[in-house]
Amino acid sequence: PYVSTHPMFGPTFANLGNLSKENTIIIAESDHLGKVFFKDLYTMLKLNICEYTFEEHDKVVAYSLGIPFASTLVFASIMKHQDAPGTTFKRHMKIAHGLLSEDDYLLTEILFNPRTPNQIERIQEQLTILLDIINRKDAAAMKEFLTRVRKNIE
């Protein structure tokens, strides 16, 4: 018997003194008593608990970790020192520093998830669309793009 869980937070960004806004996954195929143990433990820690199959877990991780990890790595890969960075830039840099302070093995495992490449392809598709709009200086298309993006985050 085994039990598999995946806390969806780490010491870099989570407030370990108050985990009530953090999530954890318990794998559905795990041993029943092991799941009960971790559900009790995570409930005491006030974590939001989701139970997923291994397949569902991989989809969630590719989406909720693969996308921001890849986006942050691409951002950081072209960075240079800025004497007068804007607030958005500074926030992105803080995220990049935090992500890159994580263990290389963890980052690699998230990015090598078999479902991550599809998510990165989706990013590339949207970058291609955005670049085309910018190159054409198409204000109407930009407005449509921004409207669609805003709906995505509602």
What would you call each of these model-derived segments?
Residues 51-154:
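An accessory alpha-helical subdomain
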Residues 1-49:
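Rossmann-fold dinucleotide-binding core
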